[in-house]
Amino acid sequence: MKTYLYSGTAEHPVYADVVPAMPGPRRHPIVMLHGGFHNGAGFLATPDGREGWAPMFARRGHDVYVMDWPGHGRSPAGADFVRLSMADVGRALGALLQDTGPAIVFAHSAGGPIAWWVAEQYRSLVAAVVGLAPGPPANLVPALPAEPAAHAGADAGGHPVYAPADRPAFVDRAFIKAFWANGSRFPQAALDAYARSIGPESPRILNERFNIGGSGLRLSDRERLRGLPMLVLTGDEDPRHPRELDGALAAFLGADFLWLPSIGISGNGHMLMIEDNHQQLAARVAGWLGEQGL
């Protein structure tokens, strides 16, 4: 039976759904971390009503915690939402890990830079990291000028590079379809339901993601990740995550890299955990965890 808890920091509390492990051998807890503009709903169920990854991995023997970033989903938003940083989310995740004990972190998209940083800063509380089309740490992102005027007219695959710092960022349906509902395996019949789950984002987080003014979240000591099982999982219909880019991320981290076409799986875009073969992908991740003794 699904329950919930509130965790996080005093400044940035977070809500997490808790899907308890099914009876049987117990494994490490899993914390599932969504990306920008999203919340944890996509790990609980798909927008077209199929079972999500959280209950799937609970059957494998994991207590699963699906966290909403501060100010997202059911996590309270503070008056400083426009100043919410990736490190703020990371510290909230670190507090949740103190509640769960050492856990495997699944991180999607913009959750990636947060997860890599948390693995470095809270090393004893992270048993492994599974990156799902994950963003890189700022070590791999060239710093862009801090002045907004320097980015006038610039875009990153369809949206402005710079987000005005004085107001939350929103996206429209065209953006949602181009950026996230872009793979041939996305459940297009449920696009409306999916679009209704998308909320505003902190402009600071977006600017950190593009390393505006060198503000991105960096790793300070990769040696702290040595020996940590890490996986980067990427599909072939995610134009902002080409094989070369995510392969370079995996190499930088010392992670395993699973380019899905290399095992005969094609058509996956950005939203791997809700696409029509999400059970197959979950099984691949479970197999990798098994290989790590997790």
What feature does the model see in each segment?
Residues M1-G24:
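N-terminal cap/lid segment of alpha/beta-hydrolase-fold proteins
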Residues G24-R26, I30-H62, V66:
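Short, surface-exposed "cap/lid" segments of acyl-processing enzymes
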Residues P102-L140:
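Conserved hydrolase catalytic core segment
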Residues G36, D63, D68-G73, G135, ...:
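Short beta-to-alpha linker loops that shape the active-site pocket of alpha/beta-hydrolase fold enzymes
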Residues M67-R83, S266-G267:
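Glycine-rich "HGGG/HGxG" loop immediately N-terminal to the catalytic nucleophile
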Residues A146-L245, A255-W259:
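Alpha/beta-hydrolase
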Residues A87-A103:
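Conserved acidic catalytic loop of the alpha/beta-hydrolase fold
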Residues I263-H278:
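Catalytic histidine-centered segment of alpha/beta-hydrolase-like enzymes
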